[in-house]
């Protein structure tokens, strides 16, 4: 979706395999949630 702010998680390490785990880590960082993104499967948090 256009217009959504995403930033790379600071606490998530390794390949992002599940959106649920990524979202949990992002919420722990104070973001709204997150998901795995891109070819390199990085955890991106929604701000």
Curated annotation (Swiss-Prot):
One of its GO terms (biological process) is killing of cells of another organism. The keyword Zinc-finger does not apply. It holds the Pfam family Gamma-thionin. Disulfide bonds join 5-47, 16-36, 22-43, 26-45. PROSITE patterns: GAMMA_THIONIN. Keywords: Antibiotic, Antimicrobial, Disulfide bond, Fungicide, Plant defense. Fabatins have antibacterial activity against Gram-positive and Gram-negative bacteria. High activity against P.aeruginosa. No activity against S.cerevisiae and C.albicans. Belongs to the DEFL family. This is Defensin-like protein 1. It comes from Vicia faba (Broad bean).
């Amino acid at each position: 979706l256009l217009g959504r702010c995403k930033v790379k998680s600071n606490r998530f390490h390794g390949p992002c395999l599940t959106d649920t785990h990524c979202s949990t880590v992002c919420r722990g960082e104070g973001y709204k949630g997150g998901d795995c993104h891109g070819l390199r499967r990085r955890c991106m948090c929604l701000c």
